[in-house]
A protein has these predicted regions:
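Mature extracellular/extracytoplasmic regions of secreted and cell-surface glycoproteins
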Residues: 25-288
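Short, conserved catalytic/metal-binding micro-motifs enriched in Asp/Glu and His
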Residues: 1, 15-22, 32, 299-303
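Acidic/proline-rich low-complexity IDRs
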Residues: 13-17, 22, 45, 54, ...
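Intrinsic disorder/low-complexity signal
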Residues: 5, 13, 30, 323-326
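Intrinsically disordered, low-complexity segments enriched in proline/serine/threonine
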Residues: 7, 30, 36, 91, ...
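Cleavable C-terminal sorting propeptides in eukaryotic secreted/cell-surface proteins
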Residues: 285-326
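Bacterial N-terminal signal peptides that target proteins for export
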Residues: 3-14, 307-309
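Cleavable N-terminal signal peptides of Sec/SRP-targeted secreted and luminal proteins
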Residues: 9-29, 289, 313-319
Length: 326
């Protein structure tokens, strides 16, 4: 089986995750989903899209590029596949299948939860930082052709199942939509490797057609609509809005070809990701251009504190006490 090794799970980490699982059931769902969020993702919609079939419709081979929004890594010695250590056979990677264009509003290009930043924008799609700060996946690297060489991912984001506080713990156990991302030094564009993964018991392998589905689930969640993977081409475009913490984002999406191959060549997990005789990836990259169209009267993390259940404030203290026992 083709795989990438996963970091060994320690007793401490497993204990923290078990505690987090219990905390998920304690925090009321009505409090865990901020009233200011109007994004349209749901568990049912997520499962529905996951059942979609693969596609192989990208046939154009010339590079399609949005001027000024990003530089193709391929133009300067970089790659559009991540670098995964320890694969068999060696040299396999995962596709950088979503790009947040540097033509987006500058606030969205800042790695922050505040002021409408990237992390707040990702919460429109239910993508949050990892469970209690515990990184369970193996690190991957990417070379974006920006003079930095091979760079480790900034971080991994996981689907929070509607609970923005500790819901990513559920994704760690159950699997689902997740992504790694890197920031191109020359443009400030974000390059993301998005996929749908299996549960923890399955070693977080990628589900059949999981790279294409992950890309399209993210696009659908950000634009508030279902994306039919089977009908996509390099002329497909989508637009839609989503809100989180009183920030409303307009997302315009262009699917482009020429950056990735319509192929299984060099793709990690290709044997399990291929579906119905179709290749592991369809060769399409979703390029997002994002504008903030509405803002709260006052911004910043402190404005959200009254909405946070008291138990989430106490969690760090509880974890510190537990860690002292190990």
């Amino acid at each position: 089986m083709v795989y990438s090794p996963k970091t060994s799970t320690t007793t401490t980490t497993l204990s923290l995750l078990l505690i987090a699982t219990h905390l998920i059931s304690i925090i009321p769902s009505t409090q865990a989903s901020p009233a200011s969020s109007s994004s349209q993702w749901s568990d049912n919609a997520l499962r529905s899209v996951e059942r979609a079939e693969a596609l192989g419709s990208a046939v154009k081979t010339s590079l399609v590029r949005r001027a000024g929004g990003y530089n193709s890594p391929l133009d300067n010695g970089g790659y559009m596949l991540t670098i995964v250590n320890g694969t068999y056979p060696a040299g396999l990677g995962e596709p950088l299948n979503v790009i947040l264009s540097a033509d987006s509003d500058k606030e969205v290009l800042v790695k922050s939860l505040d002021d409408g930043g990237f992390l707040n924008y990702m919460l429109v799609a239910g993508q949050g930082e990892e469970c209690l700060g515990q990184h369970l996946g193996s690190d991957q690297s990417a070379n974006l052709g920006d003079g930095k060489g091979n760079v480790t991912e900034v971080e991994e984001l996981r689907y929070n199942y509607g609970n923005p506080y500790i819901g990513t713990c559920q994704e760690t156990f159950n699997g689902g939509l997740h992504l790694r991302y890197w920031i191109q030094n020359t443009t400030n564009a974000y390059f993301m490797a998005v996929s749908v993964e299996m549960d923890l018991n399955s070693g977080h392998d990628i589900v059949p057609n999981g790279y294409n589905l992950g890309r399209d689930q993210l696009v659908g969640n950000l634009t508030g609509q279902a994306i039919d993977t089977n009908t996509l081409t390099n002329t497909s475009t989508f637009s839609g809005t989503g809100s989180y913490e009183n920030y409303t984002y307009q997302t315009d999406v262009q699917y482009v070809s020429g950056l990735l191959k319509n192929s299984s060549d060099d793709i990690n997990h290709y044997l399990t990701v291929e579906e119905n005789g179709r290749p592991a990836i369809d060769g399409l990259v979703a390029v997002l251009t994002v504008k903030i169209t509405a803002r709260p009267q006052s911004s910043g993390a402190w404005s959200a504190i009254p909405q946070i259940p008291m138990i989430t404030v106490l969690v760090p203290l509880l974890l510190s006490a537990i860690l002292s026992l190990f």
